[in-house]
Amino acid sequence: VQTVLDQAGVTGIALDALAVGVGPGPFTGLRAGLATAAALGLAWDVPVHGVRSLDALAHAAGVDAFRHGIEEFVVATDARRREVYWAHYAQVGGQPTLLHGPFVSPADEVTPLPVYGAGAGLYPEALRAVPDWETATPSAVGVGQVAELALRRGRGLVPAEPLYLRESDAKVPGPRKRAGA
């Protein structure tokens, strides 16, 4: 965090707000990022805004979609377990707008539209990948850009809470087995 602030030439107390990716994504990564953002928000007395990771990727992809006349598209990322996290967007006023989702499903259940993101690169037999976007993933820059744009336009953002689309892989251990005497 300090390195990023140093590179930007600012201090934490100079910030007006923080933006954090809320997922969908891996449980541990989401919890770590959200806990860090919440702690920094408290320490610096600034609000913390949530941004869906798929929205961050859609924001980046939207420029390409607009340039190529793609009115509706899907963003998909790796959800592991042979599934993708995905959402369906449309260009509205030159900006991607969420129509449906986010979802988690096997790739062959995704809406048949051009697909931006690493999910398309993983499942080329099921998804119509947009060339040069088959490895794209959400970025911190994209999260910040979506938050800044929404706040400038007076739009709300999602709560800074994890967006889980399925149950955790972690299991609570059952009772201990006792050895027979």
Regions found by a protein language model. Name each.
Residues 47-139, 154-158, 164, 169, ...:
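Surface "functional belts" at beta-alpha junctions
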Residues 4-8, 43, 61-64, 140-153:
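Stable alpha-helical structural segments in soluble proteins, enriched in small hydrophobic residues
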Residues 18, 25, 40, 115, ...:
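A residue-level signal for conserved active-site and pocket-lining positions in enzyme catalytic cores
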Residues 19-48:
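DPxDG-like acidic metal-binding loop motif
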Residues 1-27:
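N-terminal beta-alpha supersecondary unit
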